Amino acid sequence: MCPMILKRLLRPSYLEVLDQKSQRLKTLTEDLVEASKASSGNLKLEMADIDLVELVQQTNGEFEERFEQRHLKIISDFPDGMIIIRADGRRLWRVLENLYTNAFKYAQEGSRVYVDVASVDGKAIFTMKNISEKPLNISPDELTERFVRGDVARTTEGSGLGLSIARSLTQLQKGEFVITIDGDLFKA
């Protein structure tokens, strides 16, 4: 290789860009594999009793600093006491992580993200609501399809697999994953 070209390629800015792109490709590949396994049911689940209230509180803590970057405020409503569910902790964490990441990317900057945990008729219910920064001109079913994003202009990074993975992982654990859209209100 020509020394001049090699010298240019080895500049820190080029290396940083190459590193970022390779990390993005790695993440996309991992997401594709996980989406495929989750939707086909080919994931081994390690079911255990999990306190959903505690897990969501921990998730709030994990994302709080990140949300502050976009001036998003988490407003939570939790019951007194625990809500124990039978789930795979790692897979359930991934569902929550995907939902919180979705809120971080697409919620209107400076707005609130509402997170509720409740028990209704013996069922644990997790709800997240936020106002979308851009109009949601897409159906809830389309949002959970692979490679579909609410940000049609694609101004944010992402593979369009997050909600699809979250839905598949929830269903794999015998849960329900429901999204509703009312104007620019997103609710999962």
Predicted regions and their residues:
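Conserved micro-motifs of the catalytic ATP-binding
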Residues: S40-L45, I84-A87
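Short helix-loop "hinge" at the ATP-lid/N-box region of the Bergerat-fold HATPase_c
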Residues: A103-F104
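Short beta-strand/loop element within the Bergerat-fold HATPase_c
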Residues: G110-G122
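Conserved catalytic submotifs in the C-terminal HATPase_c
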Residues: E46-I50, E68, K73-I83
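Short conserved segment of the HATPase_c
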Residues: P135-V148
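Glycine-rich ATP-binding loops of the HATPase_c
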Residues: K174-D182
